[in-house]
Structures are given as structure tokens and as C-alpha cells.
Swiss-Prot record:
Biological-process GO terms, alphabetical: beta-lactam antibiotic catabolic process; response to antibiotic
Stated name of the protein: Beta-lactamase SHV-34
Name of the gene this protein is made from: bla
The keyword Membrane is assigned to this record: no
Protein keywords: Antibiotic resistance, Disulfide bond, Hydrolase, Plasmid, Signal
Length: 286
């Protein structure tokens, strides 16, 4: 009996100590929900095959917030591919067209901005006025929703303009998506024939150049890893990110994380999303 116990002790000594390991992705999400006192929706999808690798509340509705800007610029690029729009076309606007948080567009009242520059501002700096100007070119919220239906997304909906679309009222279906629908739509835009190869590269590059996502998954990204992303935020308890990730500077997976109905501060929301991202990456590397 003593020999048996010694064998068990010796065997246990060779096993990795779980207390030193980061939580598994789903364990981290459950922990995040507890600490946030809110809901988390997440999906991890293989970019090439579309296979779901990890999911939590993936079919639940969450406010899109500024993550919709990726889909918006996808719709703009589809119009470019169809010959109905040009990235070089200049759009002029007035002071009354500006809304809160327009760090790029507010500097170009005198000279205007091209469609391509507006997309870059909307994605890389989350410029709200740039998004509204682009939204007008695709038929407004109804036009963008119609585009989504055309590419097979029957869930995601945009109902309002910036900045009202960030209201994020509990239980409100307006301006929402699900992690699963957003991931599938992003995959269609970047891998299918919905966009030309040139437009796919352009959309991805705008996401690579994102300059306002530092505190989220980028903060835990290992050296040499690829990331292209777009974040969203609301003052009413919501936060989100859509991202493409992969080692060896290659996009291999889509990760979508949304938070809703949390009283946590923005810094706490950022920290929880970073923690979920870190758990996904560590699990990936095993």
C-alpha cells in the first residue's frame, strides 16, 4: 500500500501544476462574467474552414457599437467593386455634419476627405462622423442592413446612425449582432467572392492599422503574431472587438468578443477582454 502511494506521489510530481496555468478559454469567460456582473459573447472561428473552435453565448444578441464600421467599409468596397463607388472620390461636409468623437474628419472641414480616407478614419481611429458620411453612401442603416441580408447575414441589423447606435439599452435588439453572425460575415467579406481580392486586402489592412485597440487583445499578443481588429464601446455597459489572429504573422482565426449589461468601468472591460484573448492564445499554443 505504501509502495502504491509512493508511485502515485511520484506520478503527480511529474504533472504540470494547474495553479500556474492560465484558465481555459471557457473558464476565463465564466470568470469574466462573474467579475463583470454582465454577459460575455464570444466565438473563435477558423478562417479557412469556418469551423467553430470555441463559443460562448455565440447566438446571443449584443450591441455592435463601432465594430459595425468594418461591415460598413465592406459594403463600401462592394460598391467599389461593382463600379458604383470610387475610393478616390472626395466628399465634402459641413460643421453640422460632425458628431462626437471625430478626431480625423474634424480636421478636414475645409478640404473634405476621400471615400478611402473616410474608411481609414472610421476603422483605424473609429471616427464617428466618417462612419456617418460613409453610411449615407450605402443607403443609411437600412441600406447597410440590406447589404447584410444580400450576403446571407439574416441576424445583424443596423437601425441608427452614430452616435445613437451606441445606446446599448438592455434587451434592445436595435443595432445588434451575435458573435456567430459577425464572425461569419467577416469571414465572407475576407475570404469569399463577395469582395475582390484587392478589396479584401484593403479591408484587412485598415484593420491591421487600427490605432485605438491597444488595451485589448493587442496588449497580450505574443511577439510575431498577426492581429487585425476593430473595437466598439458604449457608456452603457457594453464593449466589443472583432479580430483576426494568428502566429507567424498570419491571419488564421477570427475572434469576436462582446460584453453587455456590465456596471464595470471601461478599463475593467478592456482588462477582461484582454484576459479572454490571453486564454485563447495560450490554449492555441498548447
Amino acid at each position: 500500500m505504501r509502495y502504491f502511494r509512493l508511485c502515485i506521489i511520484s506520478l503527480l510530481a511529474t504533472l504540470p501544476l494547474a495553479v500556474h496555468a492560465s484558465p481555459q478559454p471557457l473558464e476565463q469567460i465564466k470568470l469574466s462574467e462573474s467579475q463583470l456582473s454582465g454577459s460575455v459573447g464570444m466565438i473563435e472561428m477558423d478562417l479557412a474552414s469556418g469551423r467553430t473552435l470555441t463559443a460562448w453565448r455565440a447566438d446571443g444578441r449584443f450591441p455592435m457599437m463601432s465594430t459595425f464600421k468594418v461591415v460598413l467599409c465592406g459594403a463600401v468596397l462592394a460598391r467599389v467593386d461593382a463600379g458604383d463607388e470610387q475610393l478616390e472620390r472626395k466628399i465634402h461636409y459641413r460643421q453640422q455634419d460632425l458628431v462626437d468623437y471625430s478626431p480625423v474628419s474634424e480636421k478636414h472641414l475645409a478640404d473634405g476627405m476621400t471615400v478611402g480616407e473616410l474608411c481609414a478614419a472610421a476603422i483605424t481611429m473609429s471616427d464617428n462622423s466618417a462612419a456617418n458620411l460613409l453610411l449615407a453612401t450605402v443607403g443609411g442603416p437600412a441600406g447597410l442592413t440590406a447589404f447584410l441580408r444580400q450576403i446571407g447575414d439574416n441576424v445583424t441589423r443596423l437601425d441608427r446612425w452614430e452616435t445613437e447606435l451606441n445606446e446599448a439599452l438592455p434587451g434592445d435588439a436595435r443595432d445588434t449582432t451575435t458573435p456567430a453572425s459577425m464572425a461569419a460575415t467577416l469571414r465572407k467579406l475576407l475570404t469569399s467572392q463577395r469582395l475582390s481580392a484587392r478589396s479584401q486586402r484593403q479591408l484587412l489592412q485598415w484593420m491591421v492599422d487600427d490605432r485605438v485597440a491597444g488595451p485589448l487583445i493587442r496588449s497580450v499578443l505574443p511577439a510575431g503574431w498577426f492581429i487585425a481588429d476593430k473595437t466598439g464601446a458604449s457608456e452603457r455597459g457594453a464593449r466589443g472587438i472583432v479580430a483576426l489572429l494568428g502566429p507567424n504573422n498570419k491571419a488564421e482565426r477570427i475572434v469576436v468578443i462582446y460584453l453587455r449589461d456590465t456596471p464595470a468601468s471601461m478599463a475593467e472591460r478592456n482588462q477582461q477582454i484582454a484576459g479572454i484573448g490571453a486564454a485563447l492564445i495560450e490554449h492555441w499554443q498548447r
